[in-house]
């Protein structure tokens, strides 16, 4: 075992340039980090720059460095999707060869009718929408009628929004459990049901931190399952536990936002364990990518960058820190959907003198294979370990 603890940070949606197959996903020219760097005045990421972020691809104001503190490269997604679930499942060794069902015209009336009958409330919306736009459009009507807001996106999701003072949280969660049950049927299949509670008044609604995801279980064991089976820790922070439907999770820690996510992974660095601590920093995607807000996205990246020294300081000699992403979400791209991009790969431990180029990894699963290799557990079916290059 080269490292007794691996800390994995997924910067949700922080892509680093279009993949060769991007045109098939209508994403030619997408470059999340590159376009943010170009658009945001005063943008700089000095700590990620020292780790080698600017050595991976050209980024304005994030120049390459002669001796990066981390090994660096980028990873390509091979699965047939560009959503959170697909990206995370591939990281942990699964190849999603069939795209998940999406509902560009809303959900079938048969599903909605049964859903309404089961929950005892009517449905508003039932269409593709941005989470903030649909609250502006239907939030007031929801408050007057008590009907829940149902919407989807370009991803395979069934989202239910409700005001916490109109529909109590426990009822909303029960409503989503009903939706999860119904959407496990092949004819209505979705990957995730998401509870989207909000507060506020018309014209000033805001989503709360009480979001809850109900994901389908991975179709095969992931590297996290292998760690758990071997008696090792597999700590899931933020929405990680939801993404894997609690499979292969030995401890689950909820988070409120990106900075809380950093606080929580720092907290696990103070724990004594052998295994993986895995966090998803969702704000980049949820608050800024989908809303096409490059300034907000850039600010969030700079806030995360400012926390890097704390993370490096908290690591022990035999710890490995990996920073990556799960897909892109270019905030200057057309539409409001994720984008098909390479993701950055930074791997740091205290023994590195000068980071080496890890190349373009052929699949996100190379990361899962590396973690499996380190802990001596069964390797995933796809992915090549780069442990010997660290």
Swiss-Prot record:
Keyword Acyltransferase (UniProt): no
Give the cofactor note text.
Answer: Binds 2 manganese ions.
Described function: Isomerase that catalyzes the conversion of deoxy-ribose 1-phosphate (dRib-1-P) and ribose 1-phosphate (Rib-1-P) to deoxy-ribose 5-phosphate (dRib-5-P) and ribose 5-phosphate (Rib-5-P), respectively.
**GO terms for MF:** magnesium ion binding; manganese ion binding; phosphopentomutase activity
Q: What taxonomic lineage is listed for the species of origin?
A: Bacteria, Bacillati, Bacillota, Bacilli, Bacillales
Q: What are the recorded Gene Ontology BP terms?
A: 2-deoxyribose 1-phosphate catabolic process; 5-phosphoribose 1-diphosphate biosynthetic process; metabolic compound salvage; nucleotide metabolic process
Q: In what pathway does it function?
A: Carbohydrate degradation; 2-deoxy-D-ribose 1-phosphate degradation; D-glyceraldehyde 3-phosphate and acetaldehyde from 2-deoxy-alpha-D-ribose 1-phosphate: step 1/2
In its UniProt entry, what is this protein called?
Answer: Phosphopentomutase
Q: Which family does it belong to?
A: Belongs to the phosphopentomutase family.
- What positions does the entry give for Mn(2+) 2 binding? 285, 290, 338
Q: Which InterPro entries match?
A: Alkaline_phosphatase_core_sf (IPR017850), DeoB (IPR010045), Metalloenzyme (IPR006124), Phosphopentomutase_DeoB_cap_sf (IPR024052)
């Amino acid at each position: 075992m080269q490292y007794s603890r691996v800390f994995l940070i997924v910067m949700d949606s922080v892509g680093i340039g279009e993949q060769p197959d991007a045109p098939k996903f209508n994403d030619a020219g997408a470059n999340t980090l590159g376009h943010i760097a170009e658009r945001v005045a005063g943008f700089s990421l000095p700590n990620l720059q020292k780790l080698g972020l600017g050595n991976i691809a050209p980024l304005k104001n994030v120049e390459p460095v002669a001796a990066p503190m981390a090994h660096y490269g980028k990873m390509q997604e091979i699965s047939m999707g560009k959503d959170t679930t697909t990206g995370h499942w591939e990281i942990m060794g699964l190849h999603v060869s069939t795209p998940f069902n999406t509902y560009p015209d809303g959900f079938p009336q048969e599903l909605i009718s049964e859903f309404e009958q089961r929950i005892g409330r009517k449905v508003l919306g039932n269409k593709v929408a941005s989470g903030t736009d649909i609250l502006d459009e239907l939030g007031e009507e929801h408050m007057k009628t008590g009907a829940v807001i149902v919407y989807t996106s370009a991803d395979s999701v069934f989202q239910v929004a409700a005001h916490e003072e109109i529909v109590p949280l426990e009822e909303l969660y029960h409503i989503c459990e009903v939706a999860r049950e119904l959407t496990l049927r092949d004819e209505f299949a979705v990957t995730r049901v998401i509870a989207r509670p909000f507060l506020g008044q018309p014209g000033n609604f805001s989503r709360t931190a009480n979001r809850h995801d109900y994901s389908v279980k991975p179709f095969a064991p992931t590297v996290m399952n292998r760690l758990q089976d071997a008696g090792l820790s597999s700590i899931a922070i933020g929405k990680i536990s939801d993404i894997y439907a609690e499979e292969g999770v030995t401890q689950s820690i909820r988070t409120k936002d990106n900075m809380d996510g950093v606080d929580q992974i720092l907290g696990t660095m103070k724990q004594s364990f052998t295994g993986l601590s895995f966090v998803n920093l969702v704000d980049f995607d949820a608050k800024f990518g989908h809303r096409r807000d490059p300034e907000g996205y850039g600010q969030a990246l700079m806030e995360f960058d400012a926390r890097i020294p704390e993370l490096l300081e908290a690591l022990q000699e035999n710890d490995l820190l990996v920073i990556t992403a799960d897909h892109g979400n270019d905030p200057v791209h057309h539409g409001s959907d994720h984008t098909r991009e390479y993701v950055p790969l930074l791997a740091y431990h205290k023994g590195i003198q000068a980071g080496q180029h890890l190349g373009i990894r052929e699949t996100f699963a190379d990361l899962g294979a590396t973690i499996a290799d380190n802990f001596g557990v069964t390797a995933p079916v796809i992915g090549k370990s780069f442990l010997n290059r660290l």
